[in-house]
């Protein structure tokens, strides 16, 4: 028996603004092509550096125009609005592997909120050659509180 540490990242958007992330399209994890974070201080110095809002940029697959605000046939039409709550969650823990198969598993995995922010903008990026994408920009709670999350 061996224990293995795991980490899987899941991203959720509360598209209908109902306070949960349980609705059909709230998980955007399967559409993510690329994701990057920026957070911390504008300078490394504690004396002159200022805290800045975290920023999450996600590039999503958008072949069906699901993330295109003008697409009236999208399941998310009317919900692709600034200010929607976004959560990044990590699935962390251990799982046990055995040299033979049981009809059940011995897992100790937990999904934990790693980061929370608010949607700033969605920019569809159609491509004449290849995959249509959309870029989502999200600012952290500090930016939301300072009202600087809006462009």
What are these regions (language model features)?
Residues 1-151:
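Assembly/oligomerization scaffold segments
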